[in-house]
Amino acid sequence: MPQHICELTYDLIQRGVLTFDKSANDDKVVTFHDSCNVARASRMGDSPGGQFEIPRAIIRACVNRFHDMAPETIQESTFCCGGGGGLLTDDLVELRVKGALPRMQALQQVVEEHGVNYMAAICAICKSQFTKVLPYYKHPMDMIGSVHGLVSNAIVLGAKQ
């Protein structure tokens, strides 16, 4: 049965196959963006809500500092990145910037409260969108990254025999 890469990674973590050095990500204070297509139209794992819990569990396995955005802005109540639905074109950048406003406001809150400097996502559209719009909101474009980028930074190769 096909599975999302997060499901495979989570399974390997649960079985102790992957080992991490969380300190490899100590330069990052991380939050997570629930991509709207994944949040509303996907399922991960064996139980409802896996699409929310699995990416966060992977992040927590790889970083020492993780902070969710406000509860009313995540999971089933997540905000669209503003770039989906065919909007991911430079011709529509003004609309994309406006569409990202609710997420940018939620992000700004955790930046101010917790010093967040990295927003992880699992959707390629979201990552492309945020790379473009983050500078409009006075954040560096490299503030957005992938969950598996964190995995890659922290993985300890050759730890298991």
Task: Kindly give the residue locations of the regions a language model identified.
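Iron-sulfur cluster-binding electron-transfer modules in prokaryotic oxidoreductases
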Residues: 1-161
